[in-house]
C-alpha cells in the first residue's frame, strides 16, 4: 500500500483550510451584522464563574449497563478534558424569576423565596434550557447546560461513584438487589429536604460551590442503555433523549418535563431531594454559530 507523503498532506490541508477559514469568517461577519449571532449585552451582571484548567478526568460513565442480561456497574474511564468555565453557584431563584418577568422563562412551581443567594428549584430540563437561552441573549455570551462529563470534571472529588461493588462475573441477581436496597435505604435516611443558601455545602478543590448538597443538577446528557460483551466492551447502545441525567449525591435520570422529582419521573433509585442547575460558559469558537442555527445553546 502506498501512503501520501507529508508534503502532499500539508498541501491538501492548506487547500481545504483557507476556504474553510474564509467561509467561517464570512459567516461570522454576516451573523454579527444581521444580529443572528449574539454580541455582548449590558442588561445585567455576568454570573460568577470558576475556570478549571485542562486536565485528566477519571469517572464512572453514566447510563444503564448490562452484560449477559444482568445489570452491571458502569465502567470507569480516563480522559483528557479541555479547560472549562462554569458557574460557581447554582442559578439563583432571583435570577430565574427575573427571566420569568422578562418573558424568557416559565414560572416555576415551588413557592420558595426569590432570593439572590438561594438556588432555584422546581425547574425542569426544558425550563433550564429556556433560561440558558435568555441569559445568552442578555449577556451576549453563550451559556448552556453542562454535559455529565463536564459536571464530573468540575465536581472533582465530590462527584459520586455510583458503583455497587458487586463482582461483575456474578450471575446471582439477588446480590445486586440486596446491595442496591442497602444503598437506597442509606440515601433515604440522610435527607435535608429544603434548599439552603449559597455556601451551605462548601466548595471543592476547584472552587465549585454546593455540589452534592441537596440539589441535583440538570445536565445535557441523555440516558443511555449499553450492552457489554464478556470483556466489558460496548456492543450496542440506545439513547433516550427525553430523559436526562441529573447529578448530586448520586446520579438520577429524570424526564425532561419533571420539576418535582419526589412526585415521580425518576427511572431508578431514590429520587433527588430537589432539582436545579448551573450553566457552562461556552467559549468554543463555533458556539455562536450553533446558537444561531439551532436557536438555543448546544
Regions found by a protein language model. Give the residues of each.
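Disulfide-stabilized, aromatic/cysteine-rich ligand-recognition loop
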Residues: 2-36, 203, 238-298
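Short Gly/Pro-enriched turn/cap motifs at secondary-structure boundaries
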Residues: 75-76, 197-200, 267-271
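Soluble non-cytosolic domains of exported or imported proteins
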Residues: 86, 90-91, 118-126, 145, ...
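Short linear capping/connector segments at secondary-structure termini
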Residues: 110-118
Amino acid at each position: 500500500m502506498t501512503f501520501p507523503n507529508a508534503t502532499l498532506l500539508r498541501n491538501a490541508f492548506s487547500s481545504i483550510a483557507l476556504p474553510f477559514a474564509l467561509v467561517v469568517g464570512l459567516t461570522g461577519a454576516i451573523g454579527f451584522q444581521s444580529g443572528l449571532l449574539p454580541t455582548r449585552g449590558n442588561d445585567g451582571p455576568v454570573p460568577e464563574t470558576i475556570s478549571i484548567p485542562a486536565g485528566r478526568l477519571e469517572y464512572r460513565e453514566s447510563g444503564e449497563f448490562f452484560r449477559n442480561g444482568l445489570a452491571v456497574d458502569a465502567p470507569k474511564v480516563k480522559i483528557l478534558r479541555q479547560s472549562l468555565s462554569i458557574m460557581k453557584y447554582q442559578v439563583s431563584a432571583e435570577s430565574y424569576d427575573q427571566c420569568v418577568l422578562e418573558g424568557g422563562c416559565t414560572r416555576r412551581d415551588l413557592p420558595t423565596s426569590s432570593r439572590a443567594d438561594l438556588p432555584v428549584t422546581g425547574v425542569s430540563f426544558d425550563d433550564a434550557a429556556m433560561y440558558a437561552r435568555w441569559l445568552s441573549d442578555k449577556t451576549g455570551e453563550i451559556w448552556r447546560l453542562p454535559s455529565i462529563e463536564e459536571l464530573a470534571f468540575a465536581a472533582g472529588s465530590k462527584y459520586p461513584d455510583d458503583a455497587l461493588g458487586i463482582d461483575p462475573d456474578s450471575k446471582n441477581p439477588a446480590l445486586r438487589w440486596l446491595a442496591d436496597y442497602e444503598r437506597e435505604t442509606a440515601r433515604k435516611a440522610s435527607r435535608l429536604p429544603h434548599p439552603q443558601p449559597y455556601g451551605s455545602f462548601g466548595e471543592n478543590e476547584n472552587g465549585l460551590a454546593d455540589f452534592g448538597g441537596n440539589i441535583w443538577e440538570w445536565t445535557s446528557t441523555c440516558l443511555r442503555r449499553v450492552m457489554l460483551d464478556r470483556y466489558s466492551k460496548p456492543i450496542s447502545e440506545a439513547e433516550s433523549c427525553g430523559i436526562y441525567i441529573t447529578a448530586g449525591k448520586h446520579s438520577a435520570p429524570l424526564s425532561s418535563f419533571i420539576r418535582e422529582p419526589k412526585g415521580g419521573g425518576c427511572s431508578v433509585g431514590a429520587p433527588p431531594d430537589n432539582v436545579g442547575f448551573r450553566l457552562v460558559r461556552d467559549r468554543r469558537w463555533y458556539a455562536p454559530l450553533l446558537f444561531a442555527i439551532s436557536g438555543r445553546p448546544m
